[in-house]
């Protein structure tokens, strides 16, 4: 193996559920010396700490007697192309240690190449899905742009409708004004006649009032004269009293007649005001009715326009919904493809992780089997050594019994250790059998999972066939749509050519119409200028009429004031007359107080005369104002008649010109609307044709790309399924072969263990029989020794008795060989 001092150690800590792929360069075949060196190094080499998803139960390996504990000694597994060293982890840190040079295989390289291919294919599918998502986003953006365009169009339509309503309102106002002017012109003649009649009535009433006022003034003058005479004459006669009473009665009559004339004048003025108010109310009512009729017509027209716009909006919404449905189907297909891809990826990763785990577990089982083989070989060597030692012991037993006793005790201890080790081995074998059963159950679970995966693969294949059928149906629908669009294109091209011919013909007929229209515009401008002049004249006349009306209202107010003052004067006069009557009736006897009363009456008469003079002046001013107003009204009536005649003539001309202009405008509007509609229809159809062509090209490209992607995905899926099947079958075969090998090895180890147990039992029996023989021999030798000692003692006693105690006996005892042969105490 290579020198690993140059490369530093690499420690990787990963979660338990994440699979780890380790790529390591392949090493040359290791030599025996290098393997021994690497075995001695242990944890000092370049190692990788990999936390596996499945924790392996780490046990302390069995150590033969006479060696130290191998808790931190690594296990080694060698193969001609590979080498693997594993240091069992401590109980505190369950971390498996692997060498970087022990996991490099050609299968891993091929698997990683396949994984890279799968990743590339997945990236291509992700790119395709991203393209589809971007296209869906583009379609969403186009839909949002279309919605915004529709909203802008709606706002423009609302603005246009508002402008149309304003223009229509202005037109209605202008029409109402023109109609009012016409009605005023029609009603002026009747009003003139009615005014003349009212003027005559008012003049007659005013003359009557003036006459009554003059008569009252004469009566007042007569009263003044009589009062003056009474002043000069201190005594009143019966004639004077009669004249006073007559004059008073005449005054009362004149005042009553004046009151009646004033009442009639007030009634006439009230009737006139009521008539004017009723006429105004009728005019306002007619105008309101006309406005209501026009508003109803405009409302109906706007409702029709709104219905048309609602229909267009509904059609556009239906198109948008169709596009949304298509986008939803596309997004659902993309989501299903993504989910299928993710599911397949997850399954592939899970299966690869399970395969890697199974490979690691199989390698661990092989290592444990190799360890068991090494331990069995060590046990066999130990048994051979024990046999050799037994032979040696047999040879040495003959030489020294005491040494055999000590060795027998040692051998008994060693036999006890062997019994303990055999019990441990039995436990280890039972654990190995339990692990084998667990591996068999796991293998059965893997087989079941494989069956489930095969069922899922069948379901996925069915789903792929369904998707292919759906794609074929979509392609057929797209072909049908494309054929229908091509037919529409042909129709629209034919209609476009017809519209072009009609447009050229209309353009040819449009030039003379433009000349006529320019002439009509000039005439309309002239008429508008004349109409503006007439409108200015009419406004001036209206202002003058309003001024005269205001002046008439002021005069009527002044007349009402005069009436009120006259009433007040009449009331005061009545009160004074009644007081005078009472005074005359009560104070006829008291003639002494007449001068005071006369003075008071003279003062009151002077005040009344002053008031009458003021009223006369006011009457004169009012008559002058009324005469001025009459002259102004007559002059304005003449002007109004002239203006009416001119206006009627201008109206006739305006009507004729407006009829001509309306006809020309209608024709122009019809032609312009037709041209605009034709141009819009042509532009829309060209845009629709262009968009349809672009959509056809895009959809054909999308269909082609999707078909290619589906074919490639289906082929890749089939290849992957076949490869996974082949890999699973090969792995199953390898696992079955390994399991069979392990079972054969277990059976061999079991037979070897049975043989070892039998040999051990035989050895124990032989050893015990030999021990019994040795014990028997020892007892025999002891008995012979005792008998010999007894015999020697007998001889001693006999020699002592025969020869007596002397030096001869002592020397004889020291030199006797039997004494030397006896074992030391």
Swiss-Prot record:
Residues 139-212, 240-418, 456-793 form a coiled coil. This is Outer dense fiber protein 2. Testis-specific. Expressed in the proximal compartment of the elongated spermatid tail; later expression progresses to the distal spermatid tail compartment located in the lumen of the seminiferous epithelium. In spermatids (stages II-III) expression of the tails peaks and remains strong during the remaining steps of spermiogenesis (at protein level). Expression correlates with the onset of spermatogenesis and is first detected at 30 days. Higher expression is seen in testis of 40-day-old and adults that are older than 50 days. No expression is seen in 10- and 20-day-old testes. It comes from Rattus norvegicus (Rat). Keywords: Cell projection, Cilium, Coiled coil, Cytoplasm, Cytoskeleton, Developmental protein, Differentiation, Flagellum, Isopeptide bond, Microtubule, Phosphoprotein, Spermatogenesis, Ubl conjugation. The modification Phosphothreonine is found at residues 87, 105, 226. The lineage of its organism: Eukaryota, Metazoa, Chordata, Craniata, Vertebrata. Residues 532-696 are annotated as: Interaction with BBOF1. The modification Phosphoserine is found at residues 68-69, 90, 101, 104, 110, 124, 134, 256, 627. GO terms for cellular component: centriolar subdistal appendage; centriole; centrosome; ciliary transition fiber; cilium; cytoplasm; microtubule; outer dense fiber. Seems to be a major component of sperm tail outer dense fibers (ODF). ODFs are filamentous structures located on the outside of the axoneme in the midpiece and principal piece of the mammalian sperm tail and may help to maintain the passive elastic structures and elastic recoil of the sperm tail. May have a modulating influence on sperm motility. Functions as a general scaffold protein that is specifically localized at the distal/subdistal appendages of mother centrioles. Component of the centrosome matrix required for the localization of PLK1 and NIN to the centrosomes. PANTHER family: OUTER DENSE FIBER OF SPERM TAILS 2 (PTHR23162), OUTER DENSE FIBER PROTEIN 2 (PTHR23162:SF8). Belongs to the ODF2 family. There is a cross-link at residue 133 (Glycyl lysine isopeptide (Lys-Gly) (interchain with G-Cter in SUMO2)). Residues 27-46 are annotated as: Disordered. GO terms for biological process: centriole-centriole cohesion; cilium organization; protein localization; regulation of cilium assembly; spermatid development. It is found in: Cytoplasm, Cytoskeleton, Microtubule organizing center, Centrosome; Cell projection, Cilium; Cytoplasm, Cytoskeleton, Microtubule organizing center, Centrosome, Centriole; Cytoplasm, Cytoskeleton, Spindle pole.
């Amino acid at each position: 193996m290579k020198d690993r001092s140059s490369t530093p150690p690499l420690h990787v800590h990963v979660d338990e559920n994440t699979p780890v792929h380790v790529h390591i360069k392949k090493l040359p075949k290791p030599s025996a010396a290098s393997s021994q060196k690497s075995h001695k190094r242990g944890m000092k080499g370049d190692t990788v700490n990999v936390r596996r998803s499945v924790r392996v139960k780490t046990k302390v390996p069995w150590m033969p007697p006479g060696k130290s504990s191998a808790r931190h000694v690594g296990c080694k597994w060698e193969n001609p192309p590979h080498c693997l060293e594993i240091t069992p982890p401590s109980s505190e840190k369950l971390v498996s240690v692997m060498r970087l040079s022990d996991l490099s295989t050609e299968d891993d390289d091929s698997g990683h190449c396949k994984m890279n291919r799968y990743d590339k294919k997945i990236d291509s599918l992700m790119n395709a899905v991203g393209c589809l998502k971007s296209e869906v986003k583009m379609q969403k953006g186009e839909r949002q742009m279309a919605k915004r365009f529709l909203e802008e169009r709606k706002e423009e339509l609302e603005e246009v409708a508002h402008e149309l309503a304003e223009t229509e309102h202005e037109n209605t106002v202008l029409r109402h004004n023109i109609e009012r002017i016409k009605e005023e012109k029609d009603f002026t003649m009747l009003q003139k006649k009615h005014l003349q009649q009212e003027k005559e009535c008012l003049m007659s009433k005013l003359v009557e009032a003036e006459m009554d006022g003059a008569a009252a003034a004469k009566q007042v003058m007569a009263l003044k004269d009589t009062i003056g005479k009474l002043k000069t004459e201190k005594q009143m006669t019966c004639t004077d009293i009669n004249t006073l009473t007559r004059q008073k009665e005449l005054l009362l009559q004149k005042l009553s007649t004046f009151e009646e004339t004033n009442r009639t004048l007030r009634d006439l003025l009230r009737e006139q005001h009521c008539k004017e108010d009723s006429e105004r109310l009728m005019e306002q009512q007619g105008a309101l009715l006309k406005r209501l009729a026009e508003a109803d017509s405009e409302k109906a027209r706007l409702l029709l326009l709104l219905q048309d716009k609602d229909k267009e909006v509904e059609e556009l919404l239906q198109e948008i919904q169709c596009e949304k449905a298509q986008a939803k189907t596309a997004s659902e297909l993309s989501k299903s493809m993504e989910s299928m891809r993710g599911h397949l990826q997850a399954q592939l990763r899970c299966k690869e992780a399970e395969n890697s785990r199974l490979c690691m577990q199989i390698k661990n089982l092989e290592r444990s089997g190799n360890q068991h083989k090494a331990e069995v070989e060590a046990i066999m060597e130990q048994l051979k050594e024990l046999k050799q030692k037994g032979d040696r012991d047999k040879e040495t037993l003959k030489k020294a019994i005491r040494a055999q006793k000590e060795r027998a005790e040692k051998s008994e201890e060693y036999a006890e250790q062997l019994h303990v080790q055999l019990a441990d081995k039995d436990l280890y074998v039972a654990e190995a059998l339990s692990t084998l059963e667990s591996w068999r159950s796991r293998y059965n679970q893997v087989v079941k999972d494989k069956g489930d995966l095969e069922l899922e693969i069948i379901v996925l294949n069915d789903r792929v066939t369904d998707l292919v059928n759906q794609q074929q149906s979509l392609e057929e629908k797209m072909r049908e749509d494309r054929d229908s669009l091509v037919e529409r294109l042909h129709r629209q091209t034919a209609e476009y050519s017809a519209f072009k011919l009609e447009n050229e013909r209309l353009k040819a007929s449009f030039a003379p119409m433009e000349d006529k229209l320019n002439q009509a515009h000039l005439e309309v401008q002239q008429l508008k200028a004349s109409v503006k002049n007439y409108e200015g004249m009419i406004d001036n006349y209206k202002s003058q009429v309003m001024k005269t009306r205001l002046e008439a209202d002021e005069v009527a107010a002044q007349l009402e004031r005069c009436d009120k003052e006259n009433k007040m004067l009449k009331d005061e006069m009545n009160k004074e007359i009644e007081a005078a009557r009472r005074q005359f009736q009560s104070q006829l006897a008291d003639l002494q107080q007449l001068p005071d009363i006369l003075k008071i009456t003279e003062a009151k008469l002077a005040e009344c005369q002053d008031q009458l003079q003021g009223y006369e002046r006011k009457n004169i001013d009012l008559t002058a104002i009324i005469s001025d107003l009459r002259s102004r009204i007559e002059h304005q009536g003449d002007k109004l008649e002239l203006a009416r005649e001119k206006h009627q003539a201008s109206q006739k001309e305006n009507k004729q010109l407006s009829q001509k202009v309306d006809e020309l405008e209608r024709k122009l509007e019809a032609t312009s609307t037709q041209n605009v509609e034709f141009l819009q229809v042509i532009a829309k159809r060209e845009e629709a044709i262009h968009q349809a062509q672009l959509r056809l090209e895009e959809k054909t490209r999308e269909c082609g790309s999707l078909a290619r992607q589906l074919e490639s995905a289906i082929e890749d899926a089939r290849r992957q399924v076949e490869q996974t099947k082949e890999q699973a079958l090969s792995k199953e075969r390898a696992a079955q072969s390994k399991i069979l090998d392990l079972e054969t090895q277990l059976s061999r180890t079991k037979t070897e263990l049975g043989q070892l147990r039998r040999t051990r039992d035989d050895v124990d029996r032989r050893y015990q029989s030999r021990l019994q023989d040795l014990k028997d021999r020892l007892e025999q030798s002891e008995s012979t020794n005792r008998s010999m000692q007894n015999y020697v003692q007998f001889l001693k006693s006999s020699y002592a008795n025969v020869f007596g105690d002397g030096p001869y006996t002592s020397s004889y005892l020291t030199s006797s060989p039997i004494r030397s042969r006896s074992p030391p105490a």
